[in-house]
């Protein structure tokens, strides 16, 4: 689960991290009043969406007057912001962050992720702030400095000092950086974060460190024990189909192709998408129905897939392990009848009672195309989509 910038900064402030004075606003009038409370001559106004690239898309501006801030809010609130990280529809803007402007002397990067290989939290720091860290890692990896935190021990001050030295910080800046590092390390573990970024972490003209931006991603599997963070969830930033799928414990990700995919198992789902691509098709989605491919869940999966008007055919690829293929076949038939599927459906069954499952499909009165293999299934569904 992602947080907005203003929410991330609220958490930063709780852990004693320096953040600009700012106010999250729901209306143009609130933005106008917030600008009046900020003492700096210039105010920064930012659209709050779960996507990067806001500045280049016009979602971040600098204004001298309260009226300018209000006009920005009037322009964006209730509209969608399209960036390079969103789809063509963009993300809805429901809040505007109004902040004091900062005198920036230098920009740094500070972030943290869970390293599954070492089972530790790895902090990354760089002098190349304000740009995508992926680009820095690719072009100049030597400029990224790391510190691994043992979750049983927690962040250590010496690790923060080492990073500060490598960033070229001096004097009181080192103390400030260590405080930020220690706070973030504690926050990361306490709130079950999966990713944390401050980009940029700036050095102001006065020589102080300031968290100018914030990005937080929380491990969704840990939300059951993070009630405070659950309340920060913004459903407006999610694809409607993905949100509906989550209610049925279906893992769904919308894509831009025309072949709907319904599979049990994330690895098999990715393999299915690959082979559809290999045979000239374009997947319309990733959908993992999991181990419980019941009639009800399959029916909901069909509804979600077919809510995308671009879908011209559906490939159902099921491996029967604990669940028998004949039972799955009956569930598919029932779901197709219930939903009233109007596009070609190709089904490939493999595993326990696979032959019996294919026989059940063949003897049904539902128009389902049975496939003998994964390659056969991909070829048939691509051909069906092209003919539609």
UniProtKB/Swiss-Prot annotation:
Keywords: ATP-binding, Ligase, Magnesium, Metal-binding, Nucleotide-binding, Tricarboxylic acid cycle. Its cofactor is Mg(2+). Pathway: Carbohydrate metabolism; tricarboxylic acid cycle; succinate from succinyl-CoA (ligase route): step 1/1. Its EC number is 6.2.1.5. InterPro entries: ATP-grasp, ATP-grasp_succ-CoA_synth-type, ATP_grasp_subdomain_1, Succ-CoA_synthase_bsu_CS, SUCC_ACL_C, Succ_CoA_ligase-like_bsu, Succinyl-CoA_synth-like. Mg(2+) binds at residues 199, 213. This is Succinate--CoA ligase [ADP-forming] subunit beta. It comes from Vibrio parahaemolyticus serotype O3:K6 (strain RIMD 2210633).
């Amino acid at each position: 689960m992602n947080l907005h910038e203003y929410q991330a900064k609220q958490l930063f402030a709780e852990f004693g991290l320096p953040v600009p004075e700012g106010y999250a606003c729901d209306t143009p009038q609130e933005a106008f009043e917030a600008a009046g409370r900020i003492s700096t001559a210039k105010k920064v106004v930012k659209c709050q969406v779960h996507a990067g690239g806001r500045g280049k898309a016009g979602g971040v501006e600098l204004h001298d007057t309260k009226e300018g801030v209000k006009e920005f809010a009037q322009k964006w609130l209730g509209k969608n912001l399209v960036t390079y990280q969103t789809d063509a529809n963009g993300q809805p803007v429901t809040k505007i962050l109004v902040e004091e402007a900062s005198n920036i002397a230098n920009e740094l990067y500070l972030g943290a992720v869970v390293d599954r290989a070492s089972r530790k939290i790895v902090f990354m720091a760089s002098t190349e702030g304000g740009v995508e860290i992926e680009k820095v890692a690719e072009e100049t990896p030597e400029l990224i400095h790391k510190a691994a935190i043992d979750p049983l021990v927690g962040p250590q001050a010496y690790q923060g000092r080492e990073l500060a030295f490598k960033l070229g910080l001096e004097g009181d800046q080192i103390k400030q950086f260590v405080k930020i590092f220690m706070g973030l390390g504690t926050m990361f573990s306490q709130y079950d974060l999966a990713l944390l970024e401050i980009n940029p972490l700036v050095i102001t003209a006065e020589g102080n460190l300031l968290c100018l931006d914030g990005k937080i991603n929380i491990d969704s599997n840990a939300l059951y024990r993070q009630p405070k963070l659950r309340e920060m969830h913004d459903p407006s930033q999610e694809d409607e189909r993905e949100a509906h799928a989550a209610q049925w414990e279906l893992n769904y990700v919308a894509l831009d192709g025309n072949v709907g995919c319904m599979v049990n198992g994330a690895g098999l789902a990715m393999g299915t998408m690959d082979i559809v691509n290999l045979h000239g098709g374009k997947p319309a989605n990733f959908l993992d129905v999991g181990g419980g491919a019941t009639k009800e869940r399959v029916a909901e999966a069909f509804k979600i897939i077919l809510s995308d008007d671009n879908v011209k055919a559906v490939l159902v690829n099921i491996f029967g392990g604990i669940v028998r293929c004949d039972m799955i076949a009956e569930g598919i038939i029932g779901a197709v009848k219930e939903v009233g599927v109007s596009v070609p459906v190709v089904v490939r069954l493999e595993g326990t009672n696979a032959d019996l499952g294919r026989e059940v499909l063949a003897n049904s009165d539902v128009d389902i195309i049975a496939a003998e293999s994964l390659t056969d299934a991909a070829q048939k569904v691509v051909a069906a989509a092209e003919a539609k």
